[in-house]
Design a protein with these regions (language model features):
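Topogenic membrane-insertion module of multi-pass membrane proteins
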Residues: 1-42, 46, 133-134, 139
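Small-residue-rich segments of transmembrane alpha-helices in multi-pass membrane proteins
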Residues: 16-25, 144-159, 206-210, 267-280
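Extended hydrophobic alpha-helices typical of membrane-associated regions
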Residues: 233-293
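Membrane-embedded alpha-helical segments that form the functional core of polytopic membrane enzymes
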Residues: 22, 32-60, 116-124, 167-187
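Intramembrane alpha-helical segments
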Residues: 77-165
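Acidic (Asp/Glu-rich) catalytic motifs at the cytosolic membrane interface
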Residues: 49-73, 182-205
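Functional transmembrane core segments of multi-pass inner-membrane proteins
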Residues: 146-193, 211-214, 293
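Multi-pass membrane catalytic core of lipid/isoprenoid biosynthesis enzymes
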Residues: 70-113, 201-235, 271-274
Length: 300
């Protein structure tokens, strides 16, 4: 297995978006006066590794179920193209799981034993997404899973590890990140509706029709911006407005785009999650630093 093939399996372009909820939660914790560098680094590592597990497991199980046909419109997957063997990919998955478990144990030892449950759920979730007896992605629950894992678990969990407690602000921020992240999957499943119908992958849009996708995309954008409400100041609103305009333009592009051309929208949506994280950082930072001076809501 060459490095290039490993990279295709790891899918580095998916990683910045998976880090977004972790980084924003770390920033919020730091502004609340809690920052532990060691646990912060370990949390970032667990976040990256969990995403890689999900990517590799996804390839493995989709291949096994025959969901990645030759007429695939998505990015190149070495396994379904016969460039790597099933065993090689399985071994890579096992190595990644071991690395994640070890990093996770270090994190649990440094913070709270409760995290063991969260960690087990993260690994199970990453695999159960396309594998196991009830693959979420095949039952129209992919978006819900993304919201839970990339929103509440990643954001809320990161904040809890730093602060030892949760705040409503942290939950609002984590949810905002979750809704923003959902759109990556929305575009992905919108693109794949035809193949998914054939391979019995009953995604939301296979179940309720393709026209739901752009509507859900828009709803996610609006919800993510609205959920930053605890932190808004005038500058924050301007920043979110710029983000909103860009994403709504992308949503209109999505409506006019078909098939493999949607990969561009997918990449730009993933970049949009990173952009939203930057926006959230600006919004939070301004709120904490200047608060009421800029017409923001009073911070307790």
């Amino acid at each position: 297995m060459t490095l290039r093939q490993v990279l295709h399996l790891v899918r580095p372009h998916t990683l910045p978006a998976s880090l977004a909820p972790v980084i924003t939660a770390l920033a919020l914790a730091a502004l609340d006066g809690f920052f532990r560098p060691t646990t912060a680094i370990l949390t970032v590592l667990v976040g990256l590794l969990a995403q890689i597990i999900s990517n590799i497991a996804n390839d493995l199980f989709d291949f096994k179920k025959g969901a990645d046909g030759k007429e695939r419109k998505g990015f190149e997957r070495p396994l379904s193209l016969g460039k790597v063997s099933y065993r090689e990919v399985k071994n890579l998955l096992i190595i990644t799981i071991i690395a994640t478990v070890l990093t996770g144990i270090a994190l649990i030892l440094l913070s709270s034993p409760w995290l063991f449950i969260v960690g087990a759920l993260v690994i199970l979730g990453a695999i159960a997404y396309t594998g196991g007896p009830f693959p979420f992605a095949y039952h129209g629950l992919g978006e819900v899973m993304v919201f839970l894992f990339y929103g509440l678990v990643a954001g809320g969990g990161t904040y809890y590890i730093q602060c030892g407690t949760l705040s409503w602000e942290a939950i609002a921020l984590a949810s905002a990140m979750g809704f923003a992240s959902c759109n990556i999957l929305v575009v992905n499943n919108y693109r794949d509706v035809e193949e998914d119908t054939l391979s019995d992958k009953r995604t939301l849009f296979v179940r309720f029709g393709k026209s739901l996708a752009p509507k859900l995309y828009l709803a996610n954008i609006l919800l993510s911006v609205l959920l930053l409400f605890p932190f808004y100041s005038i500058i924050g609103m301007l920043s979110s407005g710029i983000y909103l305009a860009q994403m709504m333009h992308l949503q209109r592009t999505m409506l006019r785009t078909e098939g493999a051309q949607l990969n561009k929208v997918l990449v730009r949506t993933a970049q949009g999650v990173v952009l939203f994280a930057f926006n959230a950082l600006i919004v939070i930072f301004v709120h904490y630093q200047w608060g009421t001076a800029l017409g923001g809501l009073h911070h307790h």
